[in-house]
From Swiss-Prot:
InterPro entries, per database record: Pyr_Knase, Pyrv/PenolPyrv_kinase-like_dom, Pyrv_kinase-like_dom_sf, Pyrv_Knase-like_insert_dom_sf, Pyrv_Knase_AS, Pyrv_Knase_brl, Pyrv_Knase_C, Pyrv_Knase_C_sf
Organism field: Emericella nidulans (strain FGSC A4 / ATCC 38163 / CBS 112.46 / NRRL 194 / M139) (Aspergillus nidulans)
Gene Ontology CC: cytoplasm
Protein name in UniProt: Pyruvate kinase
Assembly, per entry: Homotetramer.
Pathway where it operates: Carbohydrate degradation; glycolysis; pyruvate from D-glyceraldehyde 3-phosphate: step 5/5
MF annotations from Gene Ontology: ATP binding; kinase activity; magnesium ion binding; potassium ion binding; pyruvate kinase activity
Keywords: Allosteric enzyme, ATP-binding, Glycolysis, Kinase, Magnesium, Metal-binding, Nucleotide-binding, Phosphoprotein, Potassium, Pyruvate, Transferase
Domain of life: Eukaryota
Cofactor(s) needed: Mg(2+); K(+)
SS bonds (residue pairs): none
Binding-site residues for K(+), renumbered to this chain: 65, 67, 98-99
Record-linked PROSITE patterns: PYRUVATE_KINASE
Modes of activity regulation: Regulated by phosphoenolpyruvate substrate and allosteric effectors such as fructose 1,6 diphosphate and magnesium.
Length: 526
């Protein structure tokens, strides 16, 4: 116990010492941002020119929100993103499909008119179809048939993101709840319904979601942001729908309710990554507790080595204003300090008046926040928390990051097929960039999910291997990755470069770490 306390004290002292040396005149390297930026593409940004402008500002991942828009519209986003990628060859752009998810909604009001009600007003919430198009101030329809089975007296019901709140007084029968309104507001048509603190049995996917996922598979999207994930089995169901053709699509579980928070460990086991979706989560649980949930989920993802995205209202005021609030900038920086791999913009880039300015502001904020991270402390903590015995890939990842820190290396160059080795190196948060070289174009795109990874697609065909040709191919790829780093200015000539590779051709062989100088050739002729 005493030893543990001593270590904790040393760690805290080092962290405080690191922070005490920060100053506002620091200028981070603008050409190396570790945190990826996800941008929602909407009417204001759906063109090749706009997407290229967002890329120059810092975009890494294009997000399509399937709560809105037709297939024709989303197809145009995909086509524009792919064309933009071609115009900056070698720098992949990932495409994400964000599902609408299963939801509960009210019915239509009489005449589709808003119906005012006051705090204290008592009425019924009903699943009876006779009110589906005739809701009024006495009977409001909701389309969740099992609501009377899962909810109980004393529970809350929020309508329209909590603008209208009800307390359940009584479960009258299998179709009817007696409720009391808690605030003044309007009953309106087709508004979303939340049941905070109530476990619901909605399916993981609606029929629309299934159709949308098939559209995504057909168009070879790189990742799915799966809305309203409540349990680990939801992820398994999504994998079944994606099928063999969609096996490389990364599934990112959006945690948006108390059930998802309660079942987070089992979800984390199944998913490829997590999104802390703070909008709906802040409705389902008390807003001050979202801060705790964010810290917990990001920490568990970091320990597990799975990517985590922080999202919702990060620079919301920049939708209509050229500058963010100080609180918003602090929110972005805090997410980076917490350990988020990616941060996301929604309305700011989808419909905002200042999309490029928002991305630039987010990029600059991430760069400065990354300077404040005590990387040696983070590495030691993650290494101490790694389960023992570790597997080969994780051991090599730890060794590579340790070497990079001790050598003050300019970069870690990793050769990979699936991107898994790059993910594990990213887990241990090196200071230097991770230059990933892969012949797998899908892996180069979805590796934008991993903090610090700069993915490059290696276009040369894989040769028929013997030992000599294999080693030449390895050196060629390493040289190719180093040269790209030199051209982009993320490494400098003469830097020590930590290289991670297989020790021989084929799958399943132990990886090797070696150190080479950053030169234009590694003993190979051009």
């Amino acid at each position: 116990m005493a030893a543990s306390s001593s270590l904790d004290h040393l760690s805290n002292r080092m962290k405080l010492e690191w922070h005490s040396k920060l100053n506002t005149e620091m200028v981070p390297a603008k050409n190396f941002r570790r945190t990826s930026i996800i941008c929602t593409i909407g009417p204001k940004t759906n063109s090749v020119e706009k997407i290229n402008a967002l890329r120059r500002a810092g975009l890494n991942v294009v997000r399509m929100n399937f709560s809105h828009g037709s297939y024709e519209y989303h197809q145009s986003v995909i086509d524009h993103a792919r064309e933009a990628e071609k115009q900056q060859a070698g720098r992949p752009v990932a495409i994400a499909l964000d599902t609408k998810g299963p939801e509960i909604r009210t019915g239509n009001t009489v005449g589709d008119k808003d119906i005012p009600i006051k705090a204290g007003h008592e009425m019924n919430i009903s699943t009876d179809e006779q009110y589906a198009t005739a809701s009024d101030d006495q009977n409001m329809y909701v389309d969740y048939k099992n609501i009377t089975k899962v909810i109980s007296a004393g529970k809350l019901i929020y309508v329209d993101d909590g603008i209208l709140s009800f307390e359940v007084l009584e479960v009258v029968d299998d179709k009817t709840l007696r409720v009391r309104c808690l605030n003044n507001g309007n009953i309106s048509s087709r508004k979303g319904v939340n049941l905070p603190g109530t476990d619901v049995d909605l399916p993981a996917l609606s029929e629309k979601d299934i159709s949308d996922l098939k559209f995504g598979v057909k168009n070879k999207v790189d990742m799915v942001f799966a809305s309203f994930i409540r349990r680990g089995s939801d992820i398994r169901h999504i994998r079944e729908v994606l099928g063999e053709e969609g096996r490389e699509i990364q599934i990112i579980a959006k945690i948006e309710n108390q059930q998802g928070v309660n079942n987070f460990d089992e979800i984390l086991e199944e998913t490829d990554g997590v999104m802390v979706a703070r909008g709906d989560l802040g409705i389902e649980i008390p807003a001050p507790k979202v801060f705790i949930a964010q810290k917990m989920m990001i920490a568990k993802c970091n320990i597990k080595g799975k990517p985590v995205i922080c999202a919702t209202q990060m620079l919301e005021s920049m939708t209509y204003n050229p500058r963010p609030t100080r609180a918003e900038v602090s929110d972005v920086a805090n997410a980076v300090l917490d350990g988020a791999d990616c941060v996301m913009l929604s309305g700011e880039t989808a419909k905002g008046n200042y999309p490029c300015e928002a991305v630039t502001m987010m990029s600059e904020t991430c760069l400065l926040a990354e300077v404040a991270i005590p990387h040696f402390n983070v590495f030691d903590e993650l290494r101490n928390l790694a389960p023992r015995p570790t597997d080969t890939v994780e051991s090599i990842a730890m060794a590579a990051v340790s070497a990079s820190l001790e050598l003050n290396a300019g970069a870690i160059v990793v050769l990979t097929t699936s991107g898994n080795t790059a993910r594990m190196i990213s887990k241990y948060r090196p200071v230097c960039p991770i230059i990933m070289v892969s012949r797998n174009p899908a892996a180069t795109r979805y590796s934008h999910l991993y903090r610090g990874v700069w993915p490059f697609y290696f276009p040369e065909k894989k040769p028929d291997f013997n030992v000599k040709i294999w080693q030449e191919d390895v050196d060629r790829r390493l040289k190719w990755g180093i040269n790209h780093g030199l051209k982009l200015g993320i490494i400098n000539k003469g830097d020590n470069i930590v290289c991670v590779q297989g020790w021989r051709g084929g799958m399943g062989h132990t990886n090797t770490v070696r150190v080479v100088p950053a030169e234009e050739n590694l003993g190979l002729s051009e």
